[in-house]
């Protein structure tokens, strides 16, 4: 993985953690809104790295293709 992919995955992980925390007792404390705010702020700061890399290279788009599964003769792809 390169820096672009790992930074995006880290940002998405930071955004998903408040949803996962709702299954624990930390969700019921008064510090939970601050935790969510800090998590979103960290995800934003982390997402600046791939955005600046994208702008610096003067790319206009990114094409990604993911082969999900094959059912008999039909290929399911996500792009």
UniProtKB/Swiss-Prot annotation:
GO CC terms on record?
Answer: mitochondrial inner membrane
Q: Spell out the protein name for this chain.
A: NADH-ubiquinone oxidoreductase chain 5
> Catalysed reaction(s)?
a ubiquinone + NADH + 5 H(+)(in) = a ubiquinol + NAD(+) + 4 H(+)(out)
Q: Which GO terms describe its molecular function?
A: NADH dehydrogenase (ubiquinone) activity
> What keywords appear on the UniProt entry?
Electron transport, Membrane, Mitochondrion, Mitochondrion inner membrane, NAD, Respiratory chain, Translocase, Transmembrane, Transmembrane helix, Transport, Ubiquinone
Keyword check for Lipoprotein: no
Give the highest taxon in the source lineage: Eukaryota
Indicate the transmembrane segments per the record: 3-23, 43-63
Q: How does it assemble?
A: Core subunit of respiratory chain NADH dehydrogenase (Complex I) which is composed of 45 different subunits.
Which GO biological process entries does UniProt record here? mitochondrial electron transport, NADH to ubiquinone; mitochondrial respiratory chain complex I assembly
Q: Where in the cell is it found?
A: Mitochondrion inner membrane
Q: What is the annotated role of this protein in its UniProt record?
A: Core subunit of the mitochondrial membrane respiratory chain NADH dehydrogenase (Complex I) which catalyzes electron transfer from NADH through the respiratory chain, using ubiquinone as an electron acceptor. Essential for the catalytic activity and assembly of complex I.
């Amino acid at each position: 993985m390169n820096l672009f992919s790992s930074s995006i995955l880290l940002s998405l992980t930071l955004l998903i953690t408040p949803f996962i925390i709702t299954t624990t007792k930390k969700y019921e404390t008064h510090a939970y809104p601050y935790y969510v705010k800090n998590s979103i702020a960290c995800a934003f700061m982390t997402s600046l790295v791939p955005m600046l890399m994208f702008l610096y290279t003067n790319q206009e788009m990114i094409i990604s293709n993911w082969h999900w599964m094959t059912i008999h003769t039909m290929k399911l792809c996500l792009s």
